[in-house]
Curated annotation (Swiss-Prot):
Disulfide bonds: none annotated. Residues 37-56 bind DNA. GO terms for biological process: carbohydrate derivative metabolic process; regulation of DNA-templated transcription. It comes from the Bacteria. The gene is yfhH. Residues 1-77 form the HTH rpiR-type domain. InterPro entries: Homeodomain-like_sf (IPR009057), HTH_RpiR (IPR000281), RpiR-like (IPR047640), RpiR-like_SIS (IPR035472), SIS_dom (IPR001347), SIS_dom_sf (IPR046348), WH-like_DNA-bd_sf (IPR036388). Signal peptide: none annotated. GO terms for molecular function: carbohydrate derivative binding; DNA binding; DNA-binding transcription factor activity. NCBIfam families: PRK11557.1 (NF008590). Keywords: DNA-binding, Transcription, Transcription regulation. Residues 125-265 form the SIS domain. This is Uncharacterized HTH-type transcriptional regulator YfhH. It holds the Pfam family HTH_6.
Length: 282
């Protein structure tokens, strides 16, 4: 049996230390076959004895036999290579491994996003939201879904907020805005012409722009009164924006909780009342 296929088939039943080895071998088989057992142990973060035992659990006499199996597996792959489909996720990964890679990627994106935004900057953005007469939230595609979700939460705690995802309606809305209004634009790339045009118009009428966008300098950053940054590992060709959406969602949830903390007298009661109203529909 193909050595890589054998690892994939047994992956779900492996112990945690064995999964570390399996992850490394599945991700970098070409590198692994040139390593000694000690070198592989160091790379995977396990003991040398774990490497030998892992090879034996797979049915090989030892690590040299496993390396030979990896070489044979790689040699047989030219006609049907393992296709990368999203960052470290490959087309032939078991679903359990896909899930673990997604969790690792999304968690890393959320931690990186939290670390790049200072406490002071977060409080400044909370103040902007609390001071706004009306909050217009927008985004395109997946970012628009994050904007919609945040708008619903803001309304639950008494804010005059609305998500506008139709770009023609967005432009009509911002041109009729007042200096007390706030545009919250969510865009990982910050390059979409529609959003930047809306930001320009909001600034023209005297309003403010809060951007949730990527850390790489972009046009939306240049227009924003304040920025919160998202850090995510996204490929230029990837349209799913998986980790970016998790980072955006974490930031908006953080702002939501901060707003509740600053209105403990009324916000929790408003949430309960909103939930009670919804229950009447059932």
């Amino acid at each position: 049996m193909n050595g890589l296929l054998r690892i994939r088939q047994r992956y779900q039943g492996l112990a945690q230390s064995d999964k570390k080895l399996a992850d490394y071998l599945l991700l970098q088989p070409d590198t692994a076959r040139h390593l000694s057992s000690q070198q592989l142990a160091n790379e995977a973060g396990v003991s040398q004895s774990s490497v030998v035992k892992f090879a034996q659990k797979l049915g090989y006499k030892g690590f040299p036999a496993l390396k030979l199996a990896l070489s044979e597996a790689l040699a047989s792959q030219p006609e049907s290579p393992s296709v990368p489909i999203h960052n470290q996720i490959r087309g032939d990964d078991p679903l359990r491994l896909v899930g673990e890679k997604l969790i690792k990627e999304n968690t890393a994106a959320m931690y990186a996003t939290l670390n790049v935004n200072s406490e002071e900057k977060l409080h400044e953005c909370v103040t902007m939201l609390r001071s706004a007469r009306r909050i217009i939230l927008t985004g395109i595609g997946a970012s628009g879904l994050v904007a919609q979700n945040f708008a619903w939460k803001l309304m639950k705690i008494g804010f005059n907020a609305a998500a506008v995802r139709d770009m023609h309606a967005l432009l009509a809305t911002v041109q009729a805005s007042s200096p007390d209004d706030l545009l919250l634009a969510i865009s990982y790339t910050g390059v979409r012409r529609e959003l930047n045009l809306a930001a320009d118009e909001m600034l023209r009428v005297g309003g403010k722009v809060l951007a949730i966008t990527g850390f790489t300098p972009n046009a939306l950053q240049q227009r924003a009164s304040h920025c919160l940054y998202t850090i995510a590992e996204e490929q230029a060709t990837n349209s799913a924006s998986i980790s970016a959406c998790h980072a955006q969602g974490m930031l908006t949830d953080l702002l939501f909780i901060a707003l509740i903390q600053q209105d403990l007298e009324l916000a929790p009661e408003r949430i309960r009342h909103s939930e009670a109203l919804v229950k009447k529909l059932v």
